[in-house]
Amino acid sequence: MSEFVAKEMKVRLTFVEEVLGSSPSSEKIYSEYIASKAPDSLDTEDEIEAIGEEDRGVTVFPKQNGKPGVWDYQIKGAFKDACGGLSRVKTTESAKIKAYKKVIDKLIFVEPRFAPYQVNGKLGICERPLRTSGATGERTALAASETLPAGSSVEFTILLFDEKLEPAVREWLDYGKYSGFGQWRNSGKGRHLWDELDTDGNVIGGNNEYLKK
C-alpha cells in the first residue's frame, strides 16, 4: 500500500436495475444501429442526416478486449453526484465535506483504471424519447443507449488518502440503492447494492443483504 493511502476498500457493486452506457459512440456504430433498426424506411445516410447532429449518438460502454467496463473517473463521477445530492441533507457525512469535488479528485482514487463488468446475460439497447428546447422551439428527440442487464456486477478498490472520508464513501455507496449509475441514473437506471470484500473475496460489509446470506 502506498505511503499516501490511509485506507483501502475493495467493493463489488451488483446492479438491481439495468445500467445504461454513458460514453459517446462513433458515427460508424450509430450508422450500423440505424441500418439494423430501419433498413427499408430510408436510405441509411439520409436517416442519419434527418436525425440531426445532437440526436446522433448512441451512448455505449467502453470496452477492452471486447469486454464492457467502467473507467475509474466514471466511478469518481458517481461519487461526486452522490455527495452533491446528500450534501443537502444536513445530518449526512457528505454535508460536512467542503469543496467536495476537489476532495474527491485529490484524496479518493479508484483501481484498476478500467474495471470490467461481469455481465449477467447479453448487452441490449434502450431507446427513450427526450424533450429538448432550442431556437426552433420544443421537439422530441430519440436517445438510445447500450444496456447492461440487472444482476451484472463490477469490482474495484477505493483508495482513501484520508481515512476520515470513509463514512462518507460508505454513504455514497449506500445511496446507489436509490440513485442509479450511468446514463439516465435519475430515473433509477443502474440502481445497485454493494458488498465490501476482504482480500480473499469474502463479503465483510455493505448493504447487499441477499449476497450476505
Tell what function each PLM region has.
Residues 1-213:
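RNA-interacting cores
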